[in-house]
Each structure stands twice: as C-alpha cells, then as structure tokens.
C-alpha cells in the first residue's frame, strides 16, 4: 500500500518534506475495518499536526476519508466488505493519506448514496465537530420545535466547520448568525442557510445593536481575538464553545458576571481515549447521511485535487495555511 508521510515536523517554508512510502497492507483486528480509501479531505488540523513532534516515523496524516470496506475484524458488527463508508479517524493512528487505512467501526458510518465520494468526504470531521458542539455541549434538542426562539452566533461561517454547523443549526430550529468579510464568503454563508451574516472585519458589538444577544456562540477562528467580544454578545447563562486553542492568557473571571459556560470542543477526544460513548461519532455520521439523503444538508466541497502525491498534499497545506478557504478541499485518490 502507498502512503504519504514525513520523517520530522516541518514548516512549509522549509520546502516539501512529504514523501511516498510503501508498506504491506494491514489486517484488521478486534473492531477495526480495513478501508480502501477513495478520497480524502484536508483540514486545518493536518497543518497543525504536521508541525508537531514525530514519535514514530514516517508520520502519515489525514483524517477525513471515504472508501470501500475490504476486510473486517472479528468483533465488527456494523459493516461488511463492500460497504462504502466515511469517517474522520484519529490522530493517534495512521492517517488517511494512504491507499488503505484501519479504523474502528465505532467512528464510521455508511456514506450518503446520493452524492459523490468527493462531496461526501467533506463532511465527517467538520460534521462530527459541529454535532458534538450542538448536542453534547450546547445540549440543544433533537426536536427542532423545542429550539425555536434560540439563536447561535457562528464565528467564521464560511470555513469548513462553519459551513456544516450553519446547516445543522438551521435543521434543528436555531436562528443562525454567522460572520464573514468578503462578498464570496458572505454569499456562501447565505447559501449554507445563515439568517444574518455580519462582517468580522468590523466591530461585531456595534453590528449587534439591532440584534438580540445570542444563547450560544460557536467560535471556529482565533479565540483570543474574539474572547471579550463573545462575552459581550452572549446572553446571561449562555454557552460559548471554541475549537481553537488559546495562544494568550485570558481572564476566566470575565465569564462570571453572566454565569457563562465556556467549553473547548475537540472531536478527537473520543477516539484518542476510546471513551465508552465513542459510538456517538458513528451515530452522528449516520444522522449526517440521513440529512444529506433527505436534502436537508448539502456537501461543502469547493476544490478537488486529482491524485494522492507529495506535491498535491503540500499544495493543499499551503492553501489551508493562507486561511482564506471557503468550504473544504478534497484530494481524489
């Protein structure tokens, strides 16, 4: 099997250190399935992981994947060879930048049948992230009627996570306010279903003068930059969740006056620690498939590269590090 990996952490300005590696195709054990990978999607987390310590070389990144089940472990009950599946994987295992991959069935689901592989692969990592935010941290109802009258502010609505988060929030009855700054990103947010799109290059507090404070805020970009703004825009007893780690010290006491709940969302926590409820990721992906097939969600792929190669992977990382992507970037293997 072919893999694209690297021997040591590197920054892009050091040049392209991705290389092709070959190894024997693995055999699935326990609850693992062996997937022949058809397409992958590259995420910002790939660019961050590329710069982290390599404990076992070569490091093979890649999280989003779609492919065909080729073999199953003895404990597998959810899938059979021939099933077309999608998933987001885990950073503590070999990634999807390869022609074959082992993955636990608990974080996998059958892919939607009414869209292409290149479209479907845009959804697992960002979709699970958004589902965990809305249902595990915000604890919104699965009944849309019970969420009516509640609102969420999604910072950076045109990114990969923001794009699917907007659709999920609308599907389950929330009023959605997102942020963007360019005409094309504003139009994309509206296409995803946002009720209001604000300009995050301008003062958000001032733009909220005619908008009620929100119940929830989902920060998908630069938590440090928006920390104090989010505290101003959230309702008392509201809930803020971020997927972006702090790079500066922040005053947690600032949350006290409104009794704000603040949560970090990390969708890899379940597979890394093999939590007892890891199966939730399978269930969330199943719901994504159901909503794609029923027409409630749309895929978020905006760019496709042909062929898994060091050159394509390096170019994908370059595009993501510019932080101007709309939707998701996919590599068709």
Swiss-Prot record:
Keywords: Metal-binding, Oxidoreductase, Zinc. InterPro entries: ADH-like_C, ADH-like_N, ADH_Zn_typ-1, GroES-like_sf, NAD(P)-bd_dom_sf, PKS_ER, Quin_OxRdtase/zeta-crystal_CS, YIM1/Zinc_Alcohol_DH_Fams. The keyword Zinc applies. SMART domains: PKS_ER. SUPFAM superfamilies: GroES-like, NAD(P)-binding Rossmann-fold domains. PROSITE patterns: QOR_ZETA_CRYSTAL. CDD domains: AL_MDR. GO terms for molecular function: oxidoreductase activity; zinc ion binding. It comes from the Bacteria. It holds the Pfam family ADH_N. Belongs to the zinc-containing alcohol dehydrogenase family. Quinone oxidoreductase subfamily. This is Zinc-type alcohol dehydrogenase-like protein SACOL2177.
